[in-house]
Structure formats: C-alpha cells, structure tokens
Amino acid sequence: MKVYYENDADLALLADKKIAVLGFGSQGHAHALNLKDSGMNVCVGLKENSASWVKAEKAGLMVEKTAEAVKWADIIMVLIPDQVQKAVYENDIAPNLKPGDTLAFGHGFNIHYKQIVPPANVNVIMIAPKSPGHLVRRTFVEGAGVPCLIAVHQNVDGKAKDIALAWAKGLGGTKAGVIETNFKDETETDLFGEQAVLCGGSAELIKAGFDTLVEGGYPAELAYFECMHELKLIVDLYYEGGLSRMNYSVSDTAEYGGMTRGPRIITDEVRQNMRQVLKEVQDGTFAKEFIDECNSGYKSMEALRKSNREHKIEGVGEKLRGMMSWLFKKNPKADAGV
C-alpha cells in the first residue's frame, strides 16, 4: 500500500480553481477553512436559511446558496449528510455541473450505492480524513495534519488523482500520510466498522457489561466506572500502540483475564453475526434499509434513540460526569465554531 506525503502532491493544481465546499458542519468547516488558509479560492454552499451561514461568514468565508456555489465552482466538495445528498444533487448540483468539473465527496456512500450517478464528463473523487472535523482543523492550525484516504471514481481529464492529492495536502493530510483506496472499500469498511465495532458493537458491549453488574447486585456507579468510564483509558492505549501496548500497560491479572475470558464474550456466533452485518453492507441491504428509514421520517431511529436515552447507564453517567471537573469544557464542535 503506497502512502503519499508532502512531496507527492502539488497545491499549485488548485491555485487557479474555484472551490465550493457544500456544508459547514464538522467536516465542512475544516475543509473550507484549511483550504482557504492554504491560499485557495473557497466558497461555502449552503441552504439560504442555514444556521451555518452567519458562522461561515464570520469565519471570513464567501457564502452562496448551494446552486450558485456549484455554478461558480470548478471543484465541488459535497460534505452534507448522506441522507440528503441525493436530493441536493438532483435539485442543486446536477443542473449546474459543467463538463470538466470535479465532484468530490468525503465518504463514498452515495456514489457506491448509486444514489448519485454523475455525468461521464466530470471527475469524481473522494478525500476522506480519518478524523473528526474539529481535529482536522486543529491539527492543521498546529502545523500538522491527520491521515487521509483518497479515491478516484471517474477521471475524465487525467488529473483526478492529482487533484485529490492536492486537496489532501491543502487539508494538511500529506503531513501525516495519504492512502489511495476506492469508493467501494472505503464505504464498506467504514459502515462495517461503525456498526460492528465503533458505534454499534462497543455501545452494546458497554450496556451488556453494565447491566450484568447491576443485575448481579453491584452499585450502578461502580458498574459505570468499570464498563464505561475506564474504557477510554484502554482505547487510548490501543490508539497509541495497538493491542500489545494495552497488554503491556495493564496488570498481569487484567491481561490474563482479558485473554482467557475475552474469547468467551466474542464467540464464534458473534463472529458469524459480524459476517452477516458485513454481508448486508456489501449487498446493499443496509443502504436500502437506511434510505427507507430516512424517507419514512426516522420513526424506528427515533424510537431507538429514546430507548438509549432512557437506559439506566445514561442517568448514572450524567451524575458521575458532573463530579469530573476536567470535563467542564465546551464541546469540541463548539470550540471549532460549528
């Protein structure tokens, strides 16, 4: 796998381009501000009544309605939620695309699942920082960057990959390393990771551990500390040095207990369920389910959100976090102005 760095990308490729960033949320604000600070000509495209309009203007950015921004631009980066991209594409982007334009995405969902099918006369690329937007911005301001993925779906002028690399450099990504992938692999691994490990698997593991201790007669506060609070300490060790760093850093008791009991939690049945989750990502089952859910007004999703909010661990956690003075600070998104 080739990793691209500073000398592999040329920002001059963007110097004479007009760049539209659609959206000013977590990723949108980082892309727009980093590219602007890298010397590029950037416009943010938003809905006319968007709450982000004033924020973008206060950040020193030119702001236009989405359709006008697309019409003006040579490169259009789509950084709005997956579920609204198709409608925005059909209403505001497609009618204003010009031959030779470059259409860019931060995630491959809508291209891979053919919710958006661009015309054959435009470049289609992806630049996906592997980090939340506030860290993309913060590391850039600090003179560094976060790793990025790039991909090319259509290359009409032979420059699509070079444009993607230049964009990644403008974000600061080439200081950390840029890896080339494709829309299929990025989309499917991203969705599987979210569902099986990061957002789905970890949340269910935490709740199951908490419930087991509480049902066993232990104080809910102790259950929270053991199954939720201390997880960050372990994840930080994974982040810094992998599984070996974690095993080296914990006690022998914890290491032995984890290695001998962990496989009894993640059983062959669990692994088979993971393979089924991956299959549903690969064959489009999940994508169709999610799109149908969005079109139905999020009825199931709202019920699931309510159930999560009402779980006992949430009330216990809120009380305990109120005792942790180091947590009394702004949300990272608020710090970043989004």
From Swiss-Prot:
Biological process according to GO: isoleucine biosynthetic process; L-valine biosynthetic process
Residues holding substrate: 251
Domain KARI N-terminal Rossmann stretches: 1-181
Domain of life assignment: Bacteria
SUPFAM superfamilies from the UniProt entry: 6-phosphogluconate dehydrogenase C-terminal domain-like, NAD(P)-binding Rossmann-fold domains
Keyword Glycoprotein assigned: no
Function: Involved in the biosynthesis of branched-chain amino acids (BCAA). Catalyzes an alkyl-migration followed by a ketol-acid reduction of (S)-2-acetolactate (S2AL) to yield (R)-2,3-dihydroxy-isovalerate. In the isomerase reaction, S2AL is rearranged via a Mg-dependent methyl migration to produce 3-hydroxy-3-methyl-2-ketobutyrate (HMKB). In the reductase reaction, this 2-ketoacid undergoes a metal-dependent reduction by NADPH to yield (R)-2,3-dihydroxy-isovalerate.
Name of the protein in its database record: Ketol-acid reductoisomerase (NADP(+))
Organism field: Chloroherpeton thalassium (strain ATCC 35110 / GB-78)
Gene for this chain: ilvC
